[in-house]
Amino acid sequence: MSQAGVDRLLRGLQLLLLVLRLSAGYFPEERWNPESSLRNPTVLIALLARNSEGSLPEVLGALDTLHYPKERISLWVATDHNLDNTTEILREWLINVQNQYHHVEWRPQEHPRWFKDEEGPKHWSHSRYEYIMKLRQAALTSAREMWADYIFFLDADNLLTNPETLNLLIAENKTVVAPMLDSRAAYSNFWCGMTTQGYYRRTPAYMPIRRRERRGCFPVPMVHSTFLIDLRKEASQQLNFYPPHADYTWAFDDIIVFAFSCRQADVQMFLCNKEIYGHLPVPLRSHGTLLDEADNFVHTKLEVMVKGPPLNLSSFVTIPEKVPDKMSFDEVFLINLKHRQDRRERMKRTLYELQIDYKLVDAVYGKTLNQTQVSELGIKMLPDYKDPYHGRPLTRGEMGCFLSHYNIWKEISERNLAVSAVFEDDLRFEIYFKRRLQTLLHDLETAKLDWDLIYLGRKRMQVDEPEEPVPGVRNLVVSDYSYWTLGYLISLRGAKKLLNAEPLVKMLPVDEFLPVMYDKHPISDYSSHFSPRDLLAFSVEPLLLYPTHYTGDEGYISDTETSVLWDNLTEPTDWDRAKSRKTQQQEKLRSEALNSPSLGSPFDNTARDEL
């Protein structure tokens, strides 16, 4: 490089250094640091509770774990007309957490314990609607008076399982926005249609949003239960819960009154389903009891655990221990493979919530059985057995499943257990499971029914004819050809019948073996190897148990079908699981094959707005 080039380079460097020094402030007093970030907006959380003793430990636990600075949150908590321990739980929680929050307003009302015009604790009378509107309006007024940026309404049985919910809703920048909450049915906390009289209207837009086939933040005519209002928006000043708008002529219902207020203020409600935010129970009919409500919420907790971890309980309230029992069974068996710890923990927590005592049985893992062990057990496959869908022989997984049940039958016989219940670990319980099962046991005793085995969950394979109802026993049919051994009741005599058939020397899958033993298997060649085939088998109807996952579902795992052949450890059977028909959902029944309508559950107290 020439001397002239070097000089130009030096001058350029000097100029750059000068610019940098000027930008940093030549003198110390001219230097500055970047601005700090904005503080989180202030939020008032309004929690209204009545007879919520069963749900509060989990609902408050969710509030405890929200990812939002508690010093930016104020609490507005009201409770009234309680027949349970709701007031004491809320008082204890507020005493323990009040120093974490910016402000706490506590509005308990001890008496009266019911409204004069209500027919029961789940009946929404005119007085109750009016009172809840006044409470919501009082919370809204408090938020405005303290200049809160937002008010977040939360029902006392709505579970926020996503700790980012508040941040996510604020980020949407909407005047009124709700997180879509999941339930065990199609019900959720929004409507997609509304009639000109303000009533619910079914629309084709609802289910794609509810199923998250469409994801986003959608304009809807109604959100309720859990929602956020941005009080910084000018239009929010026109929103009110009480009194109803001067032009209001629709039904006197708090959620409809507020939806009308939004409409009059030209405020669009929005529903977001981008994430899993939380869950809510399906509401009960007006004649429901507090026991129904408690069981309904327990079922909501169980459904949460099917796809996620157990709910957090608030550490700031005293929670009494549950007292599990075996109902009237001599034993309750839970089958689980040791290496399926996630299933084990879920079922342990599930049975605890249902207050069912049980004995954990380590399942036989078929893949670990060597040929010597198989020979010592005397296991031989039923001649010419082929899987009905794939034409393959028995798998080691199916062998392990059979042995797991076989070992329980042996224990029942050896311990002389009169009546036992058997559960696998991949099932989900229907609502009111324990009470419905207790009713069944009572009816069996009253009718003096002679039985050996009763399916609690199954896949009905005979779909052409209805099954025969059992006289004198509600919700019970004579079982036809069925798959699955999710859960069943078995008598001592039934266990002995299965053992006496010597199934190990002519083994087939356990859910094929049982229909053979009650003489309803469609393949006579299989049945001909067993005699007598006099197992007295029945099934509850409607079912009390279902699988947690079906073929093709996210998270579906099969230890029976994805295995190796029983006599060839080198040949895997992990075919396309999305096409495995045996573990698919129940095939739709023809109308003439439906079991009697009178078999509907007496516990079905659900209000089904969107079911």
From Swiss-Prot:
Glycans are attached at residues 85, 173, 312, 370, 568. GO terms for biological process: positive regulation of collagen fibril organization. Pfam families: Anp1, Glyco_transf_25. Residues 575-591 have a biased composition (Basic and acidic residues). Its EC number is 2.4.1.50. GO terms for cellular component: endoplasmic reticulum lumen. This is Procollagen galactosyltransferase 1-A.
